[in-house]
Structure formats: C-alpha cells, structure tokens
C-alpha cells in the first residue's frame, strides 16, 4: 500500500474487523455527499456482499403512512429513515430485543450484535411485540461489491466500530454520527462536532 492515504484520520487507528452488527462510521472528510456523516449498521457481511443501513438519515415520512401496523413498536421519532441509495422502495426493519429474549433460536429475527436484530417483516407486529423494546424502519440500503468495502476502509473512508442498541433507537435530537465518534479512541472524539460542510465551521 502506498502512502497516498497515510494522512487520513482513520488510517492512524487500529483497524477493526467488519461483521454483522458493526458500524461503518464515515470519515469527517468523506468526499461523497451521499454518505457524509453517515453511520452504517452492517446487516450482512460475506465474501459475496456487504450491506447495511444508515442510522443517521431521517426522512420526513412517518412510519404510520407506510407501515401503520408497525407504528406502535417504532421508537420516537416515528419516522422512516433513509437506509441507503439502493432499492428505496424496500423497507428494512431493525429492532432491539428486551433483556433475556432468546435471539439464537428465533425464526422471527436474525441476531446482529448484543440485542440488535434484523426483523423479518413477513411476521406480524403481534408476533414480536413481547420480544422487542423498539424498532426502526429504513427505506433502502447501502451495498458493497466483493472487495469494495475493504478498499474504502484502507483508503480511510470508514472506521469500523461496535454498535450499541442506543444507536438504532436514538431520539431525534441525537446526532448519531457525533455520538458514535465521541465514544471511539482518541483523537476521534475531537472530530465529533465536525460539520458536514467544512465551510460551516
């Protein structure tokens, strides 16, 4: 690897492995406006593909207008989030289980990390109501071809970090990207208030 990307912030830190349930935190200087200050929760990671949803992009559309039957389980703000640029007509459901729920043997959701699950939306809300603390719904997703994400991580575009249930169910007033940056190793907390447009700084 050349030294071309050596001065990127994330390249100075120890690299964590990507896995379902990990976060891809966008670099403060990420050139792509589509992913500026994004926090991607990885849902699947394999040799064939990696895909996930952006926890930090809320739309103005209410879940009640799209999936009214799921409104009661949706954490506030009860809005549909923009998961990514692909297949925005498809909805992805993420949930946080209540403590003590047996995730491993469930056919209603797939475990991502700790109490984070990918919910099968073919089930009814009544089938999972007793298992979940709350849910978040996403229109579309982000996806990487084989080797693409690894290249972007090596370039310093993304920092891989563990996810917390609070990242998925964060209240509307929370800056998810800044919140995640604040709990990472130094010097990342120093960049937690970095604006999406540096000219605003």
Swiss-Prot record:
GO annotation, cellular component aspect: cytosol
A Pfam short name: DUF179
SUPFAM superfamilies registered for this protein in UniProt: VC0467-like
Family classification: Belongs to the UPF0301 (AlgH) family.
Protein's name according to its UniProt entry: UPF0301 protein CE2927
Organism: Corynebacterium efficiens (strain DSM 44549 / YS-314 / AJ 12310 / JCM 11189 / NBRC 100395)
Native organism taxonomy: Bacteria, Bacillati, Actinomycetota, Actinomycetes, Mycobacteriales
